Curated annotation (Swiss-Prot):
Other facts: This virus has been isolated from patient with fulminant hepatitis. A genomic mutation in 1898 creates a stop codon at position 28 of HBeAg, without affecting capsid open reading frame. The HBeAg negative variants of HBV are associated with fulminant hepatitis, but can also be found in patients with persistent infection and chronic hepatitis.
Gene designation: C
Name under which the protein is recorded: Truncated HBeAg protein
GO molecular function: structural molecule activity
InterPro entries for this protein: Hepatitis_B_virus_capsid_N (IPR013195)
Pfam families: Hep_core_N
């Protein structure tokens, strides 16, 4: 769950396509 939270924080900080792809990669 921590990873998911971190992903959300990153998305909020930098809502970009790269961030989304990174989030999907982590998940």
């Amino acid at each position: 769950m921590q990873l998911f939270h971190l992903c959300l924080v990153i998305s909020c900080s930098c809502p970009t396509v790269q961030a989304s792809k990174l989030c999907l990669g982590w998940l």
